[in-house]
C-alpha cells in the first residue's frame, strides 16, 4: 500500500502556492468571523467557505488545536479552534478548478494581569516630604486596552497605559497631615467595551500610609539637679508640635533605672511625669534621659543628676541631764565635706566638727543647742540641722517675784494666794501657819480673819529645800471707816491749805505792783469837789 504521509503536506503546499500564484479564475475563499476577541484559553468556531461548488480542497491552516464539526456542505466547513492562548491568524484555503485562494481570520486574546502590586510604603513618612508610589503589572492583554491607575482612596493620582513587561507606573506625592491613615493602591483597567465586552478591573492590595510631624527641637526636661539618697524626686518631660501626638512614645530613664511616667496629652503636645527614687547604690552623677519616638525618628534630652548622701549632723552632749555647776561638753559632727556651726558660731577652723564647753547653771535648763551643717553638691548648698536640749538639775527657789512676802486684803473679798516655787525637778510646795493651817495657794478664797497671819512656805525636791515667810493682812470694815475719815480730812485740809496759799500769793502780787506804780508816778492830793 502506498504511503500516505505526503498527504498532510498537500493543503499547506496548496495554500502557499495559492498565496504566491493566485489562479486566474474567479474562485474566492472567505472566512467567518473575520475578527474575534476571546479570553485566553477559550474556543471559537470558524467557518471556511469558497465560491466554487466543487472545490478540490477546502480547509484551514492554524497551529491551534482544531476539530472539524459535522456541519458543513460541499463548499463550506466549520472548525472549532480551542485553547487559544495568544493572538493568532488562522487561514482558510480552497482549491477550485478555476484557481486557489485564501482568507484569514484574526483572533485577539484578552486576559487580565496576573500580578498588580503596589510597592510597599514606608512604615512612617514625614509630613512635607515627597513619597514615591510605584506600581508593577505583569501580564494582561491586549496591552493597547490596558491602563494602570494609581489611587489614594478613590482619588486618581496618575493614569498611564501599561507599557513593557512588567509594566511600571510611578508618581510622587507631597505628604500632608490629611494623608495620615489614607489607603494607597494600584488598579488596572482592561477596557473592552469598544469590542462589545466590558471593563475588567484588577486592584492591588491597599497600603495604609502613616504620616508624622516631629519637631527638630528636643523635649523639655525638668528635674532636680541634686537628689538625696533614700528620697524621691519628680521628673517632667514635655514637647509641643507633635502629630499624631497619641502615637508618640516617651522613654524616661535615670541611669539604668527605667521610669514609669504618667503621660497627659494635648492637641499636639504631651507631658510625661514620673517619680524617681534613689538609693545608696545610685550615689554619684547619673544620666537622666528623656527620649521621644514618633515614626522612624526620635528626639532626646540628657541631663545629669547628682545623687548624694548627707545625714543630719550629730549633736552630742556629755550628758543630757546634769546637776547645776557641772561642766558640759557639746559637740557637733557632720559629713566630712560639710561646714558646721553650733548655735550660730562656726567651727574654727572651718570644718565638719565644732564643740562648746560650759558650766551648767539653772538658766541653762531647757537650753537648746542647734547644729547647722552645710554641704555643697553640684554647685548647690544643702543645709541640715539637728537640735539637742540640756536639762540642768538645781534646787528649789522661792523669790519675791514668784512668791510675794506680804499680802494685804480687805475682809470678805475674793482673793487668790499665789506662790510658785522654781527648780528642776519641780519642787513640792506647802505653806503652813503655826505648822498646821495651810494657805490655799492657787485657789480663790473669801478672805476672813482666820486667814490672817504669817505662813512658812517650804519648797522641797531631790535637790534640796528652801523656805520663805509670807504674811497675810486682813483689813476689817472699821479700819476702813477710819481710813476713809482720815483720807477725807486730809483732802479737806489739803484743799484749804491750797486755797490760803493761792490767796496770799495773789495779795503779794497786787502789793508789789502797787509799789512799783508809786515809784514811777508822784502822788497827787485828793481834791474834794465843790458842790454846785
From Swiss-Prot:
**Which key words are in the record?**
Cell adhesion, Disulfide bond, Glycoprotein, Immunoglobulin domain, Membrane, Phosphoprotein, Repeat, Signal, Transmembrane, Transmembrane helix, Ubl conjugation
Q: PTM Phosphothreonine: list the residues.
A: 521, 530
Q: Which cysteines are joined by disulfide bonds?
A: 48-92, 52-96, 135-186, 237-290, 332-371, 403-419, 419-457, 431-457
Described purpose of this protein according to its UniProt entry: ICAM proteins are ligands for the leukocyte adhesion protein LFA-1 (integrin alpha-L/beta-2). During leukocyte trans-endothelial migration, ICAM1 engagement promotes the assembly of endothelial apical cups through ARHGEF26/SGEF and RHOG activation.
Question: The motif Cell attachment site: which residues?
Answer: 152-154
Its domain of life reads: Eukaryota
Q: How does it sit in the membrane?
A: Single-pass type I membrane protein
Native organism taxonomy:
Eukaryota, Metazoa, Chordata, Craniata, Vertebrata
Q: Where are the transmembrane segments?
A: 481-503
The entry assigns this protein to a family as follows: Belongs to the immunoglobulin superfamily. ICAM family.
Q: What is its main location?
A: membrane
Gene Ontology MF terms in the entry: integrin binding
**What are the residue boundaries of the Ig-like C2-type domain, all occurrences included?**
41-103, 128-193, 230-297, 325-378, 412-464
Show which residues constitute the signal peptide: 1-27
GO biological process annotations for this chain's record? Answer: cell-cell adhesion
Q: How is it modified after translation?
A: Monoubiquitinated, which is promoted by MARCH9 and leads to endocytosis.
Q: Which residues lie on this side of the membrane: Extracellular?
A: 28-480
Pfam family of the protein (one) = ICAM1_3_5_D2
| The protein's name | Intercellular adhesion molecule 1
Q: Which SMART domains match?
A: IG
Name the PROSITE patterns for this protein.
Answer: IG_LIKE
Parts of the chain on the Cytoplasmic side: 504-532
Question: Glycosylation: which residues?
Answer: 145, 183, 202, 267, 296, 385, 406
UniProt-annotated location(s): Membrane
Subunit details for this protein?
Homodimer. Interacts with MUC1 and promotes cell aggregation in epithelial cells. Interacts with ARHGEF26/SGEF. Interacts (on T cell side) with CD81, CD247 and CD9 at immunological synapses between antigen-presenting cells and T cells.
Q: Which GO terms describe its cellular component?
A: plasma membrane
